Amino acid sequence: MLDSDARLASDLSLAVMRLSRQLRFRNPSSPVSLSQLSALTTLANEGAMTPGALAIRERVRPPSMTRVIASLADMGFVDRAPHPIDGRQVLVSVSESGAELVKAARRARQEWLAERLATLNRSERDILRSAADLMLALVDESP
């Protein structure tokens, strides 16, 4: 790895961590943890799936996802239903109250970020748009 690549990796990592921290604090009264909100958001965006599929999508171990799902179900944010093909499996989906929570959290983050982006000029915003696309591609291609 070139020194410039190592520096870029370090700078990007720091920027992503700081941005993540800022976004995390946009909804401090949320009743769910970040891992719970991430699972809810995945279900809201991608639809019902098995706990195993959700664990893979969230890149966590199945027992960890089982605990996340159980706590979300206890709070009424997800619904469980029998799998239509494999009776041994269940499908987890976001409930109506879970979908509302995802929308509220998304809205709080987007409002804060929109305020910050408004301080940038068009060229800077275009650079961030390209960077966001590249970063998403890097993450989505990662094993």
UniProtKB/Swiss-Prot annotation:
Residues 51-74 bind DNA. It comes from the Bacteria. It holds the Pfam family MarR. Keywords: Antibiotic resistance, DNA-binding, Transcription, Transcription regulation. InterPro entries: HTH-type_Bedaq_tolerance, HTH_MarR-typ, Tscrpt_reg_MarR-type_CS, WH-like_DNA-bd_sf, WH_DNA-bd_sf. GO terms for molecular function: DNA binding; DNA-binding transcription factor activity. Residues 5-137 form the HTH marR-type domain. Contains a winged helix-turn-helix domain connected to an alpha-helical dimerization domain. This is HTH-type transcriptional regulator Rv0880.
